Amino acid sequence: MSCQQNQQQCQPPPKCPIPKYPPKCPSKCASSCPPPISSCCGSSSGGCGCCSSEGGGCCLSHHRHHRSHCHRPKSSNCYGSGSGQQSGGSGCCSGGGCC
């Protein structure tokens, strides 16, 4: 068998397929959490801080003009451990940010 025939038989290994939709949530919360972002619980983004019950998630207000009104983490608006996979959060940081 000639060298040219050997080169035709050799093919590069197949590449791993890239997932079309990457996972929304990280597997676990990072040790250093970022500050509140637009989709989180900062008062400037319509949120109202952290919930004090049911896992300590972040509350988001339905009413942008009434930001002091806080919803407890039984709705999908809360970035807590119970709704983290649905809403993109996995917990609340001590400084008010979401993980």
UniProtKB/Swiss-Prot annotation:
<keyword id="KW-0417">Keratinization</keyword>
<feature type="compositionally biased region" description="Gly residues">
    <location>
        <begin position="81"/>
        <end position="99"/>
    </location>
</feature>
<dbReference type="GO" id="GO:0042802">
    <property type="term" value="F:identical protein binding"/>
</dbReference>
<dbReference type="InterPro" id="IPR028205">
    <property type="entry name" value="LCE"/>
</dbReference>
<comment type="subunit">
    <text>Interacts with CYSRT1; the interaction is direct.</text>
</comment>
<comment type="similarity">
    <text>Belongs to the LCE family.</text>
</comment>
<feature type="region of interest" description="Disordered">
    <location>
        <begin position="78"/>
        <end position="99"/>
    </location>
</feature>
<protein>
    <recommendedName>
        <fullName>Late cornified envelope protein 4A</fullName>
    </recommendedName>
</protein>
<comment type="function">
    <text>Precursors of the cornified envelope of the stratum corneum.</text>
</comment>
<dbReference type="GO" id="GO:0031424">
    <property type="term" value="P:keratinization"/>
</dbReference>
<dbReference type="Pfam" id="PF14672">
    <property type="entry name" value="LCE"/>
</dbReference>
